[in-house]
């Protein structure tokens, strides 16, 4: 044991990031062995040829099929493509079994979505070296559930997540801080975990094209361009990440809100709506940072005479983006503001849940122009009508209608 202990750092942590490969497709294959080795896609209504590819097997990817591709196009590339409709009940059960297996190795597990999670194995040296533990986890998932995964091994969450993306399927990658200059820095900033297309564009605007340039960039210029989040990204580009694996994290987030007390009473609607938009942006950032979504938006209006009005809107579908939160909040505002001057304004997202894979699929569609003109729910209805995929809408609702939700089940078992 003492020899094995020497394979762990004297200071610092050992973090694993377990990421299931093509999760939905892999679950389908595990439950129907005849699909093994064949091009498979999980998508919408095959008969009407209106589906969108949610995920596909690696065999399908060899034909050029990708997530978000229209089903008709995928069929053109691969006429023999096998299509399955999404089965969220099946996927949730497989996810629960996955986390049960992970819990054999450590109690320090942080699920971040239906198909991925972090483990802190710093104190698990009695089980073997970090690489041996990763191999045992990978083999257990493959043998017992027939589900492949990739695992990243690193000293912090960011590097572990980055490492797990490097080898798929069935990869195990060790990423140390000393590996960063060679393995991470040459990549474009858009390839870095946590940087989306818009953030990458902003960084490009200040002549930051690579992760190395981000790591070595001027902190003040980066902060001025994208705020405090930019400084956090710069630290991670240097390999620094102080976040802990927190098994109780989800239980702490019953709501996410922000409010602002004004130095003087305000009655200009434009200024108040501008503040409402800024508060919505702040709530959105906090939700996305924690991979959460909301099914209820609430506003608080405190008037100059201390009267307080709190109103909320129940939503049919999960939201997390700034524009959707602001849309719900501004509607409430227009319905309930009586015209008097305001001293405090607040926006809160409640009924918080994980941004599970079924909810994430709504990210896959680009209906930005429609979203500017139509309510979010109308856009989602349009997606369902056009692509024949009502499960994208109802799947997220199904997660919430269980007597004991998937999230609660995980929390009660592992947290």
Curated annotation (Swiss-Prot):
GO CC aspect terms: cytosol
The cofactor named in the record is: Mg(2+)
Location in the cell reads: Cytoplasm
Q: Where is this site: Substrate discrimination?
A: 24
* Polar residues bias (residue ranges): 246-260
Entry-linked InterPro entries: DNA/RNA_pol_sf (IPR043502), DNA_pol_Y-fam_lit_finger_sf (IPR036775), DNA_pol_Y-fam_little_finger (IPR017961), DNA_polymerase-Y (IPR050116), DNApol_IV (IPR022880), PolY_HhH_motif (IPR024728), Rev_trsase/Diguanyl_cyclase (IPR043128), UmuC (IPR001126)
Q: Which GO terms describe its biological process?
A: DNA-templated DNA replication; error-prone translesion synthesis; SOS response
Q: Where is this region: Disordered?
A: 238-260
Annotated catalysed reactions: DNA(n) + a 2'-deoxyribonucleoside 5'-triphosphate = DNA(n+1) + diphosphate
The UmuC domain, residue ranges: 15-196
Question: PROSITE patterns per the record?
Answer: UMUC
- Primary enzyme class: transferase
Residues at the catalytic site: 116
- Cofactor annotation remark: Binds 2 magnesium ions per subunit.
Predominant cellular place of this UniProt entry's protein: cytoplasm
According to its UniProt record, the EC number is: 2.7.7.7
Self-association and partners: Monomer.
Q: What function does this protein fulfil?
A: Poorly processive, error-prone DNA polymerase involved in untargeted mutagenesis. Copies undamaged DNA at stalled replication forks, which arise in vivo from mismatched or misaligned primer ends. These misaligned primers can be extended by PolIV. Exhibits no 3'-5' exonuclease (proofreading) activity. May be involved in translesional synthesis, in conjunction with the beta clamp from PolIII.
Q: What does the sequence similarity comment in the record state about its family?
A: Belongs to the DNA polymerase type-Y family.
Q: What is this protein called?
A: DNA polymerase IV
- The species this protein belongs to is Bacillus cereus (strain ZK / E33L)
User: Where is the organism placed in the taxonomic lineage, from the top?
Assistant: Bacteria, Bacillati, Bacillota, Bacilli, Bacillales
Which gene is this protein's source?
dinB
